[in-house]
Structure formats: structure tokens, C-alpha cells
Amino acid sequence: MNILTDPAKLKTAGCADTNASKCSEGDGEGSVQVQLDPNLKIGTAKVFSIYGKGGIGKSTTSSNLSVAFSKLGKRVLQIGCDPKHDSTFTLTKRLVPTVIDVLESVNFHSEELRPEDFVFEGYNGVMCLEAGGPPAGTGCGGYVVGQTVKLLKEHHLLEDTDVVIFDVLGDVVCGGFAAPLQHSERAMIVAANDFDSIFAANRIAAAIAAKSKNYGVRLGGIIANRSRETDQIDKFGERTGIRRIAHLPDLDVIRKSRLKKMTLFEMDHTDEILAVQQEYLRLATEMLEGKEPPIDGKPLKDRDIFDLLGFD
């Protein structure tokens, strides 16, 4: 079976159907978005999507969460959803080829591919995949995500997976890059204790709320990252009901781990590293257990959040 019989679809596909009225069905009034084919449901694995402002540390968070899940004995697949394809390099120690790269190499004849052509084993057995994307300024990243899941299912690579993590490009909340939400049980937002990332988190929370009306995804909470304090995040949470679920401090050793192309679980076991590892393990355990109720938060209007944040 050919997944992409026409490479031009990567540049023109704004949704899975060129009929806009069909695309909007079931996904909210006025929505023109990539739709989830019922045949592409991932199955029994727990699926989490990681969102947040560009540069806030989503890939660092995703990779270390993946390792934490693997340390808890789970079989983990991390899917990078950014054309930069740099989500998994601390796990694999290299920039792996993307799904789009390997499909292009066989002229989009997916039946010629083997699983090892596009899925790579990383640290502690975490399986890694980079979806890639269309050329800059063209096409729809959500279409690529859909085709990636389709390829995984064709090769039966999801059947033995316990946890799937989607690491999603920046703070884009268009139909395309909201596509991982259609597969997810929970969506987590990474934010620092500053105006820009909380402002982005508020808009992402609104996108998650919109998707939750027609899909099973629910907001899981905010992961405070690169933050000594959390007062602004907590102020936002008190106003919206969107709670903070983890706090990862602003440590230089975390920056160094990226430069060393290593996860935090591979760094020298100093007291501060051990504390961060324990926070990741605690968060992974809570995400697996799912004891915390989903967040029914109330995102703010832009003007309201502008007025809320800051020092009195």
C-alpha cells in the first residue's frame, strides 16, 4: 500500500479531505482541520502530547519523560513532530532521518520500507521517530503526523508499545499541528514562569479545550520548566483552574545535557541531577496512573491574561 502516492499532497494538504465541508464535520463549528481516520486510532497505548512555546524545552522534557517511562518498565515510542527533526537526538545521539526523508528515498512507496528505516532505538530502549514535515512555508504538518501513524500501524509497530509521546512543534495550534491531540489521552503544556510562555500556554489550552469537545483528549496540566520560581504560573492556574503538575528548575546542567547530546538520566549523578530525575519519575508515574482528574480549565481572553500577569 502506498501511504503517499503523490508527494504534492505534502504541499497542498490542509486537511485529509479537500472538501472543506467534510473537513469541518465533527471538529467544531467553522473548523477546517485534519481529521482522524477511525482506522488510525493508536490502540491500547497511553498517548501524551507535549506542547508549549517555541524554545521552552519541549524536546528536553519529552526525551527525559520518555526515559522515565522506560525506567518504569514501559515500552516507549517518542514521535517528533517538528520539521527540524531534533526531538530525539539526546536519545539517539544523532539526527535521525525523518519519515518524509525515507518516503522520498523510495518515491513514496511505503511498502518498500522496513521498520528500521524510520524507527530508531535510543537510550534505555526508547524507540524514536521523527515525522519531519513539508518544506518551510508549505503544506500541513498534521497531514504528515497522520501519515506517520498510518505507517506505524502498517508495520504493526504500535501493538507492543505502552506509551507514545508526541513532541509537537512550537506553540502552533492550527488544525495541522493540533492533529496529535486527536490521538492523545492527555496533553501537557511546558511553560516557564514568564509572560510569553504563559500567554502561549493559555492559547494552547484553548485549542485543547476545543479538541476535547469531539475527541478523548483532555488537558493534563502545566509542566513548569527552566524556572526558579513558579509564582506567575501558579497565579495563572488559580485564575483558570489549569494546575501545575511538575516543576523543573533552571539548572545549567540541563543546558549542558543538550550540548552533550545526553538525557539527564545519563549525566553524572549529582544531587541536583538526582532531584530532577526523581521529579521526572514522579511525573511519569502520575501520568501512567491517571489518578488526577482531567483539567476542565477556563482559558482567559488575551486582554485578561495580559492584565493578570506581572508584579503588583
Curated annotation (Swiss-Prot):
One of its GO terms (biological process) is photosynthesis, dark reaction. Binds 1 [4Fe-4S] cluster per dimer. Pathway: Porphyrin-containing compound metabolism; bacteriochlorophyll biosynthesis (light-independent). Its EC number is 1.3.7.7. The keyword 4Fe-4S applies. Mg(2+) binds at S59. [4Fe-4S] cluster binds at C140, C174. Homodimer. Protochlorophyllide reductase is composed of three subunits; BchL, BchN and BchB. Component of the dark-operative protochlorophyllide reductase (DPOR) that uses Mg-ATP and reduced ferredoxin to reduce ring D of protochlorophyllide (Pchlide) to form chlorophyllide a (Chlide). This reaction is light-independent. The L component serves as a unique electron donor to the NB-component of the complex, and binds Mg-ATP. This is Light-independent protochlorophyllide reductase iron-sulfur ATP-binding protein. The gene is bchL.
